[in-house]
Amino acid sequence: MRLISKKNLLSAIESYPDAQSAIESWYQLIKDNDCQGLEFVRNGYSRSVEQVYGYTIFNIKGNQYRLIVQINSRTKIIFFKKFFTEAEFSKINWNDRDEVKQKLGEIFT
C-alpha cells in the first residue's frame, strides 16, 4: 500500500509525540501489506477499526487518538485525511454526513 500523504502522518507524530510508536506501528502494517480492503485491515490491526461514509477510522494508542484515512483497494492507495485526539473526534456528529465532509474533506474515488 502507498500512503498519500506521509507528510501529514509525520506532522501528527510531531504534534503528538506520545503517539509516535503507535502511529509508526500502524504505518508499518499498512506499508508491509498488500491491503485487500477493510476486512484485511481489521484482521491485521488488532485495535478497533470502523468505517463511516467511506472513511476508515483507526483507534490509535489505546483509544486516545483517531487516525482517519480512505482506503482504495483497487489502486492500493491510502489517503490520509485527519488525525484527532479522542476529545476532538467525539465532538464530530458522525450522523451528519455534511459535518463529516466538512471536517474531513471530500472522498476520493
Kindly label every feature range from the protein language model.
Residues 1-64, 73-77, 86-109:
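Basic, Lys/Arg-enriched alpha-helical interface segments
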